[in-house]
Swiss-Prot record:
Keywords: Coiled coil, Cytoplasm, Initiation factor, Protein biosynthesis, Repeat, RNA-binding, WD repeat. RNA-binding component of the eukaryotic translation initiation factor 3 (eIF-3) complex, which is involved in protein synthesis of a specialized repertoire of mRNAs and, together with other initiation factors, stimulates binding of mRNA and methionyl-tRNAi to the 40S ribosome. The eIF-3 complex specifically targets and initiates translation of a subset of mRNAs involved in cell proliferation. Its main location: cytoplasm. Component of the eukaryotic translation initiation factor 3 (eIF-3) complex. The eIF-3 complex interacts with pix. Interacts with mxt. Belongs to the eIF-3 subunit B family. Residues 1-11 have a biased composition (Basic and acidic residues). It is found in: Cytoplasm. It comes from the Eukaryota. The keyword Coiled coil applies. This is Eukaryotic translation initiation factor 3 subunit B. Pfam families: eIF2A, RRM_1.
Amino acid sequence: MAKKKSEEHSGADANDSDYNEEPNFDDPPGYVDNISDEDLLGDMLAQRPSEADGVESVVVVDNMPKVEPSRLEKLKSVINKLFSQCGEIVNVVYPVDEEGKTKGYAFMEFKTASQAEDAVKKLNNHRLDKNYTFAVNLFTDFQKYENIPEKWEPPTVQPFKVQSDLYNFINDPDAYDQYCVAAETAPNCVQVGFWQNTLPEPNELETRERFTDTFVKWSPLGTYVVTFHKPGVAIWGGSSFQKIQKFPHPGTQFVEFSPCENYLVTYGPTPTGQKIIIWDIRTGAEKRSFVGDGMSVLSMFRWSHDDKFVARMGENSIHIYETPSFYLLDLKSIKIAGIRGFSWSPTDNVIAYWVEEQNQIPARVTLMEIPKKREIRNKNLFHVADCKLHWQKSGDYLCVKVDRYSKLKKDKKELDVKFLGMFYNFEIFHMREKEIPVDSVEIRELILAFAWEPIGNKFSIIHGEPNSANVSFYEVNKGVKPSLVKRLEKKSCTHLFWSPRGQFIVMANLTMGTFEFVDTTNDYIISASPDHFRASEVEWDPTGRYVVTGVSSWKVKEDTGFNMYTFQGRIIRRTILKNFVQFLWRPRPPTLLSEEKQKEIKKNLKKYYPIFEQKDRLRLTRASKELLEKRAQLRETFMEYRNKRIAEWKDQKSRRIMLRGHVDTDNLETDEVDEEVVEFLVKEEVTLLE
């Protein structure tokens, strides 16, 4: 082609000496190319379609039991039941030796490749029993491992990321607590501010726009704060609240931390119900997942106090999983016919559960020691409609609120059951005493609320009519029945909030927004009765020194914000914040001091008073100085603005005189001003008199 084009051009203009002939790229005769297609087009050839060999839907299951022919059918039944949960099984082959004994592995073909991948994901490392743990792989993995390059290339060294101190918030020399405030700036867009509760004014630490889509939540020890997003959740921590870890679980609606902050549980919707995933917080790895049957599964897991066990309730059973493997304890569930609820002790590996009445068998509350699964106490109950389990924070007592009935009315089909003549019992288990004695308190009125004193031996009950209820305080002592120590009558409260340190309690009406602060060691005197209209939440700080009440925009759309009070009910500050949604104090980890050291400090507390008083005086002096400096700065700013406007007013004098008929009105005396009164008709009314 190049030669032909050159000839045509020469014929057209033979005298054109500037024309250069195009180069000829043809290979010489007999030339053989020595480069292969793989070397030349390797990346393209790797993407070309290949003929399927039909093994994409086949999995290989290793580490299976080696059984005799007589036991093969039973093994097949167990394996098919387990793997059929992942999809339709087309064919299964169990290779056998010369004696007919299985070789410990099997080939399993599913209907689709996606079902095979799901089987690998769900059942790889599945523990069949204490001797056998499955190793499930795709058959196509053999081809992948055959093509491993012979020359080993070391992995690229990743740069070390220095993580900030996650516990810096407890190193403050004055022990100021922190809190976060969330406000919705747009739909699915929440601004979160982090503050330190310093005196006289709080100190802003950090403010993040669009920090979360819905709300935030602190971990139990205050190390992390979790945020919610469409792809999943993330946890943040450190001095500047850096991202520590993220957990991909689309549509997560709720999360739970384990008590020691080793694990995180996320709850998110699926087309068939709820999916629950348990994550390792430090590595971000998924430890185990479950599928629930609806919204009722929120908070379905219960953790032991030391993170060694996590439990959930099944049909007539409790499933207890060991960490970190998350296998069932002893590889089987605990069968309990008629179980209706359970709860862990906050300080010991003891589970309390209750079962309903069945076939003339009374209801029962049982305490079980884990991992021995040994029942350490039983209590039979009669005519039971419902039970609620309330552990005291220190684990010293368990209260079982029993809803009892006098008569039971059923329809003909026994589908609709009505309980008549309701009354209530409080069964108090003394956990620290020998053989765990049980005391009972009976109340014949409607129970509105119950709350234990976190550190102490008292509990409080709201009972009676909602608008005119009574609040009773009981004291529990060793060897005697719980005694009524005080009853406050005709109160309109609906909720009880004890101080984390005990002694003080807030009786709140979260419908009307009224609060009463009570000191339970000073003859139960009401020290203050503030109100916060439409308040929907009450939050004690971890030290029991401050209380916050909040009006959230989730409840109302106007006058949202929060108030802060002392433990005696004295108002400290009021904050009005548009679209305020949440206020949360940052939790504190338990003290590292022994009980003996704490007692010693309390005993010698008087010698620390002068130090604290001196700090208070310095703080007040510093606060006064800062206040004076702030006022001086405001005055200086105002005077600067005033002088600027006066200068502008003087520059406009000639313009004013011209507009006012060449009369200088700036220097007019009041005596020279004529006052003229003008009257005009505004309205006329006619009234007919009979």
